[in-house]
Amino acid sequence: MPAKTKEPVALVITGPTASGKSALAHEVALRTGAEIISADSRQIYRELTIGSAKPTPEMLGEVPYHFINEKTIGEPYSSGAFATESRARIAMIRKRGNPVIVAGGSPLYLQGLIEGFSDLPPADPKIREKLQKELAEQGSRALYRKLQDLDPERAATLDHTKTHRLIRNLEIIELIGKSSKPPSPTPEMQFHAVALNFPREELYQRINLRVEEMMSEGLLQEAEALLKKYRPEISNRTLPALLTVGYQELFDHLERKTPLEGAVTLIQQHTRNYAKRQLTFLRNRMQLNWIQAPLTAQERTELAESLLS
């Protein structure tokens, strides 16, 4: 890989869920006067607060954040749109003379911003209709197995519940023979990107604890309000944002399909599975500098200082 000669336009801090990237980014921003670009595909939605682990109101008051609470869940928002809009925001922030930090763990958001996307074919209604029929008749697990056979690397970044992305990837394979072309470089912007590495068992313990904390903060009540407002969309699975881990399990509980204790256990399990997929994507599909995640506030302060040096 050729050396990058341009000055990085932003520091990127990523890693699996619950690895401490948001707290680290916030501390660096406080020390530098930076503005933070959230690369989290759920924090952009106003209605998803506790389950998306948004920064607290106090944090939002201390540091300028972008792509937090900017959309409603009825507004579709893609990784391509984020890549375009976040680059424009970065240019605007730097024009003001402020540093930029990108923080988040949504893999496609990060890949699109840092590496760019190749042009992909538009949706084909006939192919999509056929795949939707397969989904209805065979179920999402059958479509997932199909993607595993055709593109195991891409399948490793998904699971069978991500039906919109499953269908899109299978559609692209039918159109061009593979689910995605190699990313297009974006030489006009270079990034200093670090990823937080966490011992697997400790990460899983943090995930379990975080879910318990979210429940204490009112995640069940947040899910109940969403179910009351969006029951048809939840039943028909027409809004991808409402398929988010942490909400769909509680919707099932509220519909009397799962006891609460079982729903919480499933949230923990599914979040651990998501962290595993994040790690697979970040390690195999992106060029990142992996560093040891801080385990204490003191270690976080020391790491923040090292990132500034």
UniProtKB/Swiss-Prot annotation:
It catalyses: adenosine(37) in tRNA + dimethylallyl diphosphate = N(6)-dimethylallyladenosine(37) in tRNA + diphosphate. Its cofactor is Mg(2+). Monomer. GO terms for molecular function: ATP binding; tRNA dimethylallyltransferase activity. ATP binds at G15, P16, T17, A18, S19, G20, K21, S22. This is tRNA dimethylallyltransferase. Belongs to the IPP transferase family. Keywords: ATP-binding, Magnesium, Nucleotide-binding, Transferase, tRNA processing. InterPro entries: Dimethylallyltransferase, IPT, P-loop_NTPase. Pfam families: IPPT.
